[in-house]
Curated annotation (Swiss-Prot):
It comes from Pan paniscus. The lineage of its organism: Eukaryota, Metazoa, Chordata, Craniata, Vertebrata. This is Pro-MCH variant. GO terms for biological process: chemical synaptic transmission. Residues 44-56 are annotated as: NEI-like. Residues 60-62 are annotated as: Melanin-concentrating hormone-like. Residues 29-62 are annotated as: Disordered. Transmembrane segments: none annotated.
Amino acid sequence: KHNFLNHGLSLNLVIKPYLALEGSVAFPAENGVQDTESTQEKRETGDEENSAKFPIGRRDFD
């Protein structure tokens, strides 16, 4: 039992950070679509706010 518990904990420590980093990539259908729509709405309504939030992206388009 002790050996099994240690193995389970080590798996959780490896999997949880991976899911946290790859969450948007792992679930594009659920999170990606909503994030994209909300981002487009923000760009249409307030370019000034976006220039502060996404300076690198705006430089690429210049």
